[in-house]
UniProtKB/Swiss-Prot annotation:
Species name: Caldivirga maquilingensis (strain ATCC 700844 / DSM 13496 / JCM 10307 / IC-167)
GO molecular function: DNA binding
InterPro entries listed in its UniProt record: SfsA, SfsA_C, SfsA_N
One Pfam family in the UniProt entry: SfsA
Name listed for the protein in its UniProt record: Sugar fermentation stimulation protein homolog
NCBIfam families: sfsA (TIGR00230)
Annotated family: Belongs to the SfsA family.
C-alpha cells in the first residue's frame, strides 16, 4: 500500500493556451497539437503558457492527447478529474479514510442524479459520498473551487437531502498540492458553493480533506488528512 499508481504518461509537451473548458493547445515534438483537459476548473495558476505538461497519446477521437499532469518544477500536479473517484475509493479500501467502510457502488443514482460513491458503514447503514479534487493552493491553503460551480453547489444540497432520507453523507476533498497545510472553501470566488457546503454541514453532512503528492514515478502518495477551515 505504498500509493495509488497511475498510468505513466507517454507524451511530454509545453502548454501554449487553453481554448475552452476541455481543450488546450500544446507544443508536442515541435508541433502545435490539440490537448484534451479533463478538469472543469480554471487552472489559471497551473495551465500557464510555457509550462511543461505530461499527457497520454490517444489513438482515436478529435484530440490525440489527454493531459494528465503539469510540472511546476518543485512538484507535479495531477490534472485529471476522471480518476478522482478511484483515488477516493482506494483511500477508503486501504483504511486511510473512513476506516471500516466498504465501497459498494460507483456513481449511485439518487434523486434524479448521481453521487460519486456509495459506502456501507461499519454499523450497516449506507453512506453517500461526493469527491472533489483540489488543485488551487495559495500560501499553503488549498481552496475549492477555482471556478464557480453551480453543479458542485447542487451536489452539496443533494447530500443534505440524502441525510434527510436516512443516509450518512460525506464530501471528500482530495488535496492534490503537496505544500497545502489547510483546506478551505473558496468563499470569495464562489460564495454560492460555500453557502451550499455550510448548509450541507448544518444538515449533518461530514467533510474531510486528504492530501496526496504525485511522485515522478507516477504514484500518488498518501500524505494524511489536512484541517478543514470553514
Amino acid at each position: 500500500m505504498l500509493g495509488f499508481t497511475i498510468n505513466k504518461p507517454d507524451v511530454e509537451g509545453v502548454f501554449i493556451k487553453r481554448i475552452n473548458r476541455f481543450l488546450g493547445i500544446g507544443l508536442i515534438n515541435g508541433v502545435e497539437s490539440l490537448v484534451h483537459i479533463h478538469d472543469p476548473g480554471r487552472l489559471k495558476e497551473l495551465l500557464k503558457p510555457g509550462i511543461k505538461f505530461y499527457a497520454y497519446h490517444k489513438d482515436s477521437g478529435k484530440t490525440r492527447f489527454y493531459l494528465t499532469a503539469v510540472d511546476l518544477g518543485n512538484e507535479l500536479v495531477l490534472i485529471n478529474s476522471a480518476i478522482h473517484n478511484n483515488v477516493a475509493a482506494w483511500l477508503i479500501e486501504n483504511g486511510l479514510i473512513l476506516k471500516g467502510y466498504e465501497v459498494l457502488r460507483r456513481e449511485p443514482r439518487f434523486s434524479g442524479g448521481r453521487f460519486d460513491l456509495m459506502l456501507k458503514s461499519p454499523k450497516g447503514g449506507y453512506t453517500m459520498v461526493e469527491v472533489k479534487g483540489v488543485t488551487l493552493e495559495e500560501d499553503g491553503v488549498a481552496k475549492f473551487p477555482d471556478a464557480p460551480t453551480l453543479r458542485g453547489a447542487r451536489h452539496m444540497i443533494k447530500l443534505a437531502k440524502a441525510i434527510e432520507e436516512g443516509y450518512e453523507a460525506y464530501v471528500i476533498f482530495l488535496v492534490l498540492r503537496s505544500n497545502a497545510l489547510l483546506f478551505t472553501p473558496n468563499v470569495s470566488l464562489d460564495p454560492r458553493f460555500s453557502n451550499a457546503l455550510k448548509y450541507a454541514i448544518e444538515h449533518g453532512v461530514k467533510v474531510l480533506a486528504y492530501k496526496l503528492a504525485l511522485t515522478r514515478d507516477w504514484v500518488l502518495l498518501p500524505m494524511g488528512r489536512v484541517n478543514v477551515i470553514l
